[in-house]
């Protein structure tokens, strides 16, 4: 299906984002624990050399070999992002210097400010806030990150360093009550591990993110739209052709009504017929 969409709407599938599997086991979340490991150059170098479609790869920077991994993929033009991590401030600062300039699903699968016995410590979240130029993304469905925290991210990181993502599974946008993974259930408008130990992805579509940011987090519509278009395009290095309505760019246009429901979609200048509800 993805290949078919790519044939119809040229340049719409921009590349691959690999979220695993160089992650912290303690922050596995919906990842498969058996696959989690530390970065291994004997594994990732052949992958990068073989697959030029990889545009982004995540890792927990506190793992052995993570700094070497970050430097390597950054040199290859791949965005390095921190994810599923328990990194402390020095880990994050060193990681940023090694090329990790972005944070995957910020606030999820990473600790915030916490206490160990009688002492208090910054978490990964605060460490990322302290690096002004580090960009973040948030699952803005209102469940993965509550609206009050979405507004906090907006106030601290700002429009130009925050982008909105769905982190959605294949069941997003459907009426399905079952996920493709038997470990996962769909409940309360979100995917969860069946044992209720963690969230496991969303069922949100991008229009829902806009509605959440505007109607619940009380963020200006123009800024919410920029965080869903302009900012991610800049982070991924495709702003020359995506992310804004300008002459010469790809004509990707969404028309919404006053309640922010989708009324029509143009992809690469072509109207997607099944989306058109404009009379």
Which role does the model predict for each range below?
Residues 1-9:
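Single conserved hydrophobic/aromatic residue that forms the stacking wall/gate
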């Amino acid at each position: 299906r993805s290949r078919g969409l790519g044939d119809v709407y040229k340049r719409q599938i921009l590349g691959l984002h690999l979220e695993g599997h160089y992650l912290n086991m303690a922050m596995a979340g919906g990842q498969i624990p058996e696959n989690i490991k530390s970065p291994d150059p004997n594994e990732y170098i052949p992958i990068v050399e073989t697959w030029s479609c990889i545009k982004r790869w995540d890792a927990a920077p506190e793992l052995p070999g993570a700094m070497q991994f970050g430097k390597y993929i950054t040199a290859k033009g791949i965005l390095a992002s921190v994810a599923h991590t328990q990194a402390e401030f020095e880990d994050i600062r060193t990681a940023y210097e090694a090329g990790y300039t972005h944070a995957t699903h910020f606030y999820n699968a990473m600790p915030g400010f916490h206490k160990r016995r009688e002492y208090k410590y910054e978490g990964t979240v605060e460490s990322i806030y302290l690096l002004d130029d580090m960009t973040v993304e948030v699952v803005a469905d209102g469940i993965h990150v509550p609206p009050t925290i979405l507004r906090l991210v907006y106030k601290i990181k700002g429009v130009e360093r925050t982008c909105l993502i769905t982190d959605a599974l294949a069941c997003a946008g459907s009426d399905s009550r079952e996920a493709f993974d038997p470990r996962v259930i769909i409940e309360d408008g979100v995917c969860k591990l069946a044992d209720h130990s963690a969230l496991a992805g969303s069922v949100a579509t991008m229009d829902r993110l806009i509605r959440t940011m505007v109607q619940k987090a009380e963020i200006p519509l123009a800024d919410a739209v920029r965080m869903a278009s302009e900012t991610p395009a800049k982070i991924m290095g495709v702003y020359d052709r995506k992310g804004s309505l300008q002459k010469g760019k790809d004509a990707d246009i969404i028309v919404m009504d006053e309640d922010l429901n989708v009324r029509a979609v143009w992809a690469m200048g072509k109207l997607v017929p099944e989306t058109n509800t404009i009379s």
